[in-house]
UniProtKB/Swiss-Prot annotation:
Keyword annotations from UniProtKB, A to Z: DNA-directed RNA polymerase, Nucleotidyltransferase, Transcription, Transferase
GO biological process: DNA-templated transcription
Family, as annotated: Belongs to the RNA polymerase subunit omega family.
GO terms, molecular function: DNA binding; DNA-directed RNA polymerase activity
Entry superkingdom: Bacteria
GO cellular component, one term: DNA-directed RNA polymerase complex
Catalytic reaction annotation: RNA(n) + a ribonucleoside 5'-triphosphate = RNA(n+1) + diphosphate
Record gene name: rpoZ
Annotated coiled-coil segments of the chain: none
Name of the protein in question: DNA-directed RNA polymerase subunit omega
Length: 72
């Protein structure tokens, strides 16, 4: 499957985050919030949590903070 079949594309999504790992992490955490009952921040027809989360990221509705502290 090429990136052009995914809407929004991976390339466009990577402009909103630091890297692919961050994209996956943010998408999964936001998807879990939606599954647990959080309200969608975008107006789309899909009810799939991952699709909603991806569109929220693409529209700039989701912010995140990179924590530099961690396991050493």
């Amino acid at each position: 499957m090429s990136n052009s079949m995914i809407n929004p594309s991976i390339v466009n999504l990577l402009e909103k985050v630091d890297d692919r790992y961050s994209l996956v992490t943010i998408t999964s955490k936001r998807s879990r919030q939606l599954i647990d009952g959080a309200k969608s921040l975008v107006d789309i027809d899909s009810t799939k949590p991952v699709t909603v989360a991806i569109n929220e990221i693409h529209e700039g509705k989701i912010t995140y903070k990179t924590v530099k502290e961690g396991i050493k």
